[in-house]
Amino acid sequence: MKKSLQLSFSFLIISIILSHGMMADAQKKNCPHKIPIKGSYCAPTICLDMCKKQHGTVGSCAE
């Protein structure tokens, strides 16, 4: 019983560490720069493409 509890805690800790690593990696891909809007509205795909071209990462539109 004691070893199965230890194994369960080990698995839990490893999964938490891996999930935090994946969240940190996803946040690194966000573009820190705002992309100016060239039209009356912001299409998310256009902003994402512009930021990829300019900075190599995913971005968001400026207001």
UniProtKB/Swiss-Prot annotation:
Which tissues does the record link to its expression?
A: Pollen specific.
Name of this protein: Protein BP4A
What organism does the UniProt record list as the source? Brassica napus (Rape)
Query: Gene name?
Result: BP4A
